[in-house]
């Protein structure tokens, strides 16, 4: 939590401000601090959540799959790779062991080899 006299970090560390540092604080908001000297302190995700009193949300992770079709392309049965464009990759919402769901509403079913039908 960022206060007028110091900081309590999400990991429990405490920092006490000097009188000059405390006097330099103009405004403390949800996302950071504005100082009288014109500098800004931008909170990172964890500090902003800690300052707001809410627990941080877990970061989403892309799942790595042991198959020939993934978020970045396809490995063909003949060993050739087909790299997706950025637009094609961005269109993939979810890739699982049996198929993929695209942002434009298509469902792609995979064969036993993990290739689209």
UniProtKB/Swiss-Prot annotation:
Calcified shell. It comes from Cancer pagurus (Rock crab). This is Cuticle protein CP1246. Transmembrane segments: none annotated. The lineage of its organism: Eukaryota, Metazoa, Ecdysozoa, Arthropoda, Crustacea. GO terms for molecular function: structural constituent of cuticle. Keywords: Cuticle, Repeat. Sequence repeats lie at residues 1-17, 26-43, 67-84, 93-110.
């Amino acid at each position: 939590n960022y206060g007028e006299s110091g900081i309590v970090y999400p990991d429990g560390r405490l920092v006490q401000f000097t009188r000059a540092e405390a006097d330099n604080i103009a405004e403390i908001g949800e996302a950071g601090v504005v100082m009288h000297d014109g500098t800004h302190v931008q909170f990172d995700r964890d500090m902003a959540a800690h300052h707001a009193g809410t627990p941080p949300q877990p970061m989403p992770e892309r799942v790595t799959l042991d198959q020939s079709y993934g978020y970045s392309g396809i490995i063909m049965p003949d060993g050739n790779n087909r790299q997706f464009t950025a637009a094609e990759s961005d269109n993939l919402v979810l890739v699982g062991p049996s198929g993929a769901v695209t942002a434009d509403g298509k469902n792609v079913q995979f064969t036993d080899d993990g290739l689209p039908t």
